[in-house]
Amino acid sequence: MWKFWVDRGGTFTDIVARKPNGELITHKLLSENPERYKDSAVQGIRELLGLTQDAALPDNMIEEVKMGTTVATNALLERGGERTVLLITKGFGDLLRIGYQNRPKLFDLNIVLPELLYERVVEVEERVNADGDVLHELDTAQVEKSLKEQYAAGFRSVAVALLHGYRFHEHERKIAKIAQAIGFEQISLSHQVSPLIKLVSRGDTTVVDAYLSPILRRYVNQVREALEADKGGCKSLMFMQSNGGLTDASLFQGKDAILSGPAGGVVGMVKTAKELNIEKLIGFDMGGTSTDVCHYAGEYERSFETEVAGVRMRAPMMSIHTVAAGGGSVLSFQE
């Protein structure tokens, strides 16, 4: 059976395949070519299998597909995620906008705040103290009324981040049940996405998850359907996470997908270097869109709280420095 390892970048998609006889082959194609194909990863796999555009995928032909993708990264950079509404404890509606009040350029008079990913805020009547004791029961009628208004306004994704929600989960769960009954398609709860203290970090990460997960889910379902993963066409479909680990397609979340593409390069660099007994490395990964630089000295370097494209989040990811200086970014044509 065939095995495929796919790196879907901003400019090119690279594929390494192992044939049933053990032979390794490579393939490269443009990541975006809408006139010829819908998705580069699927198209590349079909080309390597020798299938025509309309040919069905034979059963039991693909053993596994492992993929790193920049779909979530691009959606974040281009602000192309799902329209999201934030539900937060009453009195804290501006908290994520205020943030931590960090000012990298202290003396700048013209301060440009990063664009928020959520469009609207609903302040929820409820209150829990730091010990997890309920001070004010959740007003479910108010939540239902507010969510119905947001649903009517076209929102389908909701992020729920309540004060001390990491300690007391019940109020967030009740909100999720109400939102689900109304018809919201994406419901991200802070105690599931980032079950730790600090409401700002927890809220930011929950918003990122609600904003990106629908886009990611649509892409994953598109790939799964094209590879007929549910019908025996592909036995295993896995995606690279920002932390350098793989996860099943059904568990791939927005908050874990930001560095899905570059993280695979770091892991590949380290594995290759170890075969040569090299322990100290600087990685330089120049693609068509951006250049990624990383460092390795015996163990993977990961950050837990970081900022990507002006968005704060708290999720484990590889420490990778990215600059917009890929081959296509720095080269230009002259007659």
Map each language-model feature to its residues.
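N-terminally biased helix-coil "hinge/interface" segments that flank
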Residues: 1-335
